[in-house]
């Protein structure tokens, strides 16, 4: 069976690199897509979510923030602000970030950066959800 190579990159460098991917599932702004070897070349915007990576012998989840994916016949390149493998997520830290974001959203006196707080809450909830998928 032909496989994909997959690379997830953030501004801090490569976070994940694998050569034997059978299927990758991603959340794009147009909905969830699955990518296998031979997929039509595509570029898509990604939402905060996860990448599920299936390979012979198992699967892995990576929490990702907004970004882009470039699909080629045999290669998948994911470029995001942040990416974190499920088994490396510090759930306590994610819970703390969630509490801070909720506190900021509930503070009626300070409604500046409401969108930033909403995105922070969405990222924290995503990290908690992905950590529980492993």
Swiss-Prot record:
Localization (cell): Cell membrane
One cellular component term from this protein's GO annotations in UniProt: plasma membrane
GO molecular function: ATP binding; proton-transporting ATP synthase activity, rotational mechanism
Topology class, membrane: Peripheral membrane protein
Keyword Transmembrane helix part of the UniProt annotation: no
Keyword entries, A-Z: ATP synthesis, Cell membrane, CF(1), Hydrogen ion transport, Ion transport, Membrane, Transport
Family from the record: Belongs to the ATPase epsilon chain family.
Subunit structure, interactors included: F-type ATPases have 2 components, CF(1) - the catalytic core - and CF(0) - the membrane proton channel. CF(1) has five subunits: alpha(3), beta(3), gamma(1), delta(1), epsilon(1). CF(0) has three main subunits: a, b and c.
PANTHER family linked: ATP SYNTHASE DELTA/EPSILON CHAIN, ATP SYNTHASE EPSILON CHAIN, CHLOROPLASTIC
NCBIfam families: ATP_synt_epsi, PRK00571.1-3
HAMAP family documented for this protein: ATP_synth_epsil_bac (MF_00530)
Function: Produces ATP from ADP in the presence of a proton gradient across the membrane.
Name listed for the protein in its UniProt record: ATP synthase epsilon chain
